[in-house]
Structure formats: structure tokens, C-alpha cells
Amino acid sequence: MLGTKRHWPPGPSLSLELPLALTLLALRAGWAQEGTEPVLLEGECLVVCEPGRAAAGGPGGAALGEAPPGRVAFAAVRSHHHEPAGEIGNGTSGAIYFDQVLVNEGGGFDRTSGSFVAPVRGVYSFRFHVVKVYNRQTVQVSLMLNTWPVVSAFANDPDVTREAATSSVLLPLDPGDRVSLRLRRGNLLGGWKYSSFSGFLIFPL
């Protein structure tokens, strides 16, 4: 039409909107290839949800600001001597009790029985350190899972007065499984808190 003029290039608004739209399309295509979807919030930062990661507050995840589930840890010590136990193999074995509980996160350690009862299913780490009283005496300590011995430690050097029987182990436990220490032989020296028992949850299953 006469008197009509075309203005090219387009005005500033169109020239800015077109590259922005192309950029967003390119980003969306890249995220689609990687299996992620962008979430665009007006006036906010770009949030990307990664595949395979549990949503906050959902199964397997915790909301921001909340403590992770399944925090379990304990540590206990003795403050006095332990009574002698029978020789191994004669059917007698004594439970080792700990009268001072230093840590009991999750409430799994029972001071009355000297046992740890798993509150959640998971992989746990346990460690014990037992010191014998006299030389020329053997100390044998077994870590028990319910009624089964898992590991044992010995201290039997006749020339050493204070020798430690120490061991550690990783165990998968179900809720209600009980872990304790049994003195199979000898005396324990706990007068200066030398004997100890501790454990913690590495990760839940």
C-alpha cells in the first residue's frame, strides 16, 4: 500500500524475546536428553529436579532443616572389676555389663542387660576394648549377635599385666536384633574406665 513503510530490523522488544525463547527451547531439549525437567518460577531462580533423587519429605529423603532419619549411636564404659567367668567350653559365660553410658542416641543400648537392641534395619559398626587384670591370665571376650558369637578377642601375654582384647566388626541387623559382649575367660579391669563397648548405625537398609 502506498505510504506504508516496513521497519527492519524489528524493535528492541522482539529482538530480545526471540533469542530468549530459542535459549529456553535449547535448554529444555538438553534437559530432556539427560532425563531432567526444568521448573521455571517467575522472578525466581531455575530449579532442576534430578532423576532418582527422592523428593524432600518423601520416602528416602528428609525435608530441608530436618535431621536425617535413623541416627543411632552408643558408647558405654565400666567403672569396676568384673567377676570371673568360667573356662570356655564348660557351658558358663558371663554377660559384660557397663554401668556408665556416655552416648545413647536412638535409645538402643540397655544398661540393665548390657546389650544393644537395633531400633532400625541397617548396617552397624561395633567395637569393644577389654583389659585384663593380672598377668599369667587369659581374657577371652566374644561379641554376640543374639545367641551366636560373631567375633572373639584374646589377651594372653603372660608377661604383660594390662593387656587389651580388642576387636571391631560390621553387622547387618534387623529391628530387634541384640548385640552384647560375653566374658568367656578371665577378669576385666574397669576401675579406670579401661573397658568399653560402642557402636553406631552406618546407614539404614
UniProtKB/Swiss-Prot annotation:
Signal peptide range in chain numbering: 1-32
SMART domains assigned to the protein according to its UniProt record, in alphabetical order: C1Q
Domain C1q: 67-205
Keyword Nucleotide-binding: no
UniProt keyword annotation of Phosphoprotein present: no
SUPFAM superfamilies, A to Z: TNF-like
Glycan attachment sites: 90
Family matches, as InterPro entries: C1q_dom, Cerebellin_Synaptic_Org, Tumour_necrosis_fac-like_dom
Keywords per UniProt: Disulfide bond, Endoplasmic reticulum, Glycoprotein, Golgi apparatus, Secreted, Signal, Synapse
GO cellular component: endoplasmic reticulum; extracellular region; Golgi apparatus; synapse
Compartment(s): Endoplasmic reticulum; Golgi apparatus, cis-Golgi network; Secreted; Synapse
Superkingdom in the source lineage: Eukaryota
Database matches in Pfam families: C1q (PF00386)
Gene Ontology biological-process entries: maintenance of synapse structure
General function of this protein: May be involved in synaptic functions in the CNS.
Assembly and binders: Heterohexamer; disulfide-linked heterotrimers. Interacts with CBLN1. May also form oligomers with CBLN2 and CBLN4.
Protein name as catalogued: Cerebellin-3
